[in-house]
Amino acid sequence: KSRQSIKRYKTIFEWIKLMWPFDCGLDSVELRRVLVVYSAALAPIILSLYLIYKNKMEKWISLTLISTFLIAAFGWELWINYGVLNGQEVNLRRSEALSCAIPMNINWIVNSLGDTGIVWFGIILVGWIFRNSENFDKFYWSVFLVLFVWFMFQNILVEMVIYHHQVGGNTLLSWAPMMPFCSWFNPKLQVIGDRTVALQTQSAWIIGSFVFYYVSIYFHRTIKKKI
């Protein structure tokens, strides 16, 4: 049994070692990128575990976050990760070092977790600005506007800085349910130098702004009725 345990631990260690960014030959820019991506993915998990431990995690938020992860994963992350329909898989749009640091088969999970954290921060931001418990009782344009501005701001930042070489330029992204125009209709706005913002990559969060707000409203009202 002890030999089996040692073998199991060795296997786990080797798996972790393969994923560890420092073993992948990343340059300094890529390393910072990888650390930001993993930090963004781990943040909602760590915060959720902490709030659950403190018994302060609201059920409607838990359900909203789980739904957000699934919507992001099946709405666009899986599609553009594997280049399902008329697109390049992610490994063709980035360096070998990045493909090593964030393997393709977990890349969509990491990004979907990051998307979940973005939505959660949006909910927190709304609560901080309006400071009342009725923000998610029904649709309010003021609340939607805050969410929309936040979602679009972060996504433009991601497209221009973190994932510029993966989703910008001449990269070919797959069609996805929440990126319906694909490359067939994809006007681009040149912002700084060669950095562009494209309709295809922004459409996920344009549509998502409505979807995630309505999901939040649904679970908030449903849980509130049961109390």
Model-based region annotation:
Residues 8-227:
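Aromatic-rich, lipid-facing transmembrane alpha helices and their immediate juxtamembrane interface loops
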